[in-house]
């Protein structure tokens, strides 16, 4: 299986640069995973594809404003940190630009000394381990000084930080939003509950590896990044109940999908658990829990389009993506959505 097999042509102007005003009015492509048949809807129509007793799985991670602009304490030279993941209480793995200024022992100041970052170690793939020194509560300082770590393909400025959060975001820790969830409003979620659909919240903190291109020619040689996840007993019970009753488990986003497929046993049973996952889902994978997926339109040759192809076949996916281009759907993080049923 070659990485180039997952390539498609995408005009630059179809990459959404800003979120639309009304989250639920984005477009929705409906893709039948068996026949490849396609329908065109609006996202709030998603309720038509959810039935009483089904379980909708949402990732309630919250994006942290992980991009910090500061200066080297000794020289005043400008520096940019991008926090990737917390390794200990006040210690983070981070990408640093320019890297040559970030030798072990170097200290950097953010917000006129409100936050001091010290390089304590070098990590894999050119990142650094940073120990932070501060007075107060780290999350509050970060909220004040940090910027949202938007994906590299978004060049427009984001004026409201909350537009890059789901309305149900709860647990801080992500370097990117679980973007399929951006389409839901409180009103739509309430209507879904009223229909008798169970909602299960899981947590997976999205790392920047989600945007990292697959650089190997053979898909099987790709090494996935590691991400932290949590599944509560309540969420596990809701998912198990749906499966036991012959109902559907519908994941909102690839992160929810990767969480439940990591957290279940070989029989597809869920339990309360947490840990790190490097699960890589590509065509040939046998899903143990997932029945349907709600997701955005992904980058060519990415692990995300490979995951989607595992559900309904590469040819169906590429056909749907070409149809989306023809119909001028908006792509990537702030773009439109599809449900694979």
From Swiss-Prot:
It catalyses: 7-aminomethyl-7-carbaguanosine(34) in tRNA + S-adenosyl-L-methionine = epoxyqueuosine(34) in tRNA + adenine + L-methionine + 2 H(+). It comes from the Bacteria. The keyword Metal-binding does not apply. One of its GO terms (cellular component) is cytoplasm. It is found in: Cytoplasm. InterPro entries: QueA, QueA_dom1, QueA_dom2, QueA_sf. GO terms for molecular function: S-adenosylmethionine:tRNA ribosyltransferase-isomerase activity. NCBIfam families: PRK00147.1, queA. Belongs to the QueA family. This is S-adenosylmethionine:tRNA ribosyltransferase-isomerase. The lineage of its organism: Bacteria, Bacillati, Bacillota, Clostridia, Peptostreptococcales. The gene is queA.
